Amino acid sequence: MPLHGRHQAENITLAIAAVEAFFGSERPVPEEVLDEGLGQLTSPGRLQLIGNDPVIYVDSAHNPHGARALVEAVTESFNFEELALVVGVMSEKDASGVLRALAPIAHHVTVTPVSSPRSLDSDLLSELAHDAIPGTPIDVADSLPEALDHARAWAGAAEGRAVLVVGSVLLAGEAIAFSRSEGWGIA
């Protein structure tokens, strides 16, 4: 299964159970159909690889629960020595809760606005990040491209580092589109 995290496995298990319940026990789903379908499965914006050199992932986790699941998935699935987070959050979301949940994997953070009038102000997000992730370097960027430049430079300065863009579904989409426009060739 090409997805990361226990929560994704649980979601797939529930989906298979729903299909089996719909068709009934007299029409089981053939194993080869499941294998083929799961082998082609993608979940855009969920630990999606969008760049290499350095490695850059994007995830649309935008609440504390999703951020905790993301931290668990990153910890279980990857062996990054250090991770730079690019974080943008919408004003109506629990930014402090998201940042606290991300703290265990945050070695460097660049906050950025989301391209939306509902975006949380970057300076406020920076203050929240300093409180939620004490002792971690926090940068403020005026845009996602600037934030990615900061994070990529930091991650490229040492082996074992990577970048993770997180905090908003809109930010995830923006990062995927930006990676395509830059010709990173993955997303």
Question: Which functions belong to the PLM regions below?
Answer:
Residues 165:
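Solvent-exposed interhelical
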Residues 1-108:
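Nucleotide phosphate-binding/pyrophosphate-handling subdomain across enzymes
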Residues 172:
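RNase H-like, metal-dependent nuclease domains and their acidic two-metal-ion catalytic environment used
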Residues 19, 183-187:
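S-adenosylmethionine-dependent methyltransferases
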Residues 168:
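Active-site-proximal loop/hinge segments that shape catalytic or ion-binding/gating pockets
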Residues 55-57, 64, 99-162:
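C-terminal helical cap/extension that packs against the catalytic core
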Residues 26, 78-82, 130-135, 183-184:
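Short helix-capping segments at alpha-helix termini
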